[in-house]
Amino acid sequence: MGLSARDEELLARALDLAERGRGRTVPNPIVGAVVTIDGRVIGEGFHERAGQDHAEVVALQAAAPELTAPDFDGVLRGACIYVSLEPCSHFGRTPPCTDALIAAGVTRVVVAATDPFPQVSGQGLARLRRAGVEVVLSGGHLERRARRQNGPFRKWAISGLPFVTYKYAMTLDGKV
């Protein structure tokens, strides 16, 4: 199933939200999320700092402020969440985002790009599908944007090497 114009708009919003965490989430990626019911935005969030709640949980809590993870108990049944990067499915400093999405009753997850981190890569999407959640991977320009957005994280997750930017200046005659 392809993305509608509204899906693309909301996924682009999630990518915009992710930028708010830039420079503060290392070693984690930057991630943004938007929760909707019947196409109406009811919650937004982004991953603010490493060790704190991930974007998906922040957005779910914004949508249902009276509850906290993992006590969502189906309160958002029928909701859709748009996420800039595949939800995590492993325990780290925080519980798996996939568990929070399932507990909240989210029925559709639209993802801009898969997570390259070996503990997550494809496993988050598979976990959601096994739970009966419809999963849509964007592809196209939004996926490319999401991959670029987390370029340094992708480099580290895939190769174990740092992302290095080298700036060099010289005069026209080749002197430094």
Each PLM stretch: what is its role?
Residues 60-91:
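Mobile, glycine- and charge-enriched loop segments
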Residues 33, 41-62:
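N-terminal beta-alpha supersecondary unit
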Residues 1-22, 41, 71-77, 92-176:
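Zinc-dependent deaminase
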Residues 27-31, 53, 162-164:
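Short, basic and Ser/Thr-rich N-terminal targeting/leader segments
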Residues 46, 53-57, 81-100, 119:
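Local cysteine-cluster metal-coordination motifs and their immediate loop/turn environment
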Residues 16, 20-23, 47, 57, ...:
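Charged/polar positions on well-ordered alpha helices
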Residues 30-39, 167-169:
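Short beta-strand scaffold segments in enzyme catalytic cores
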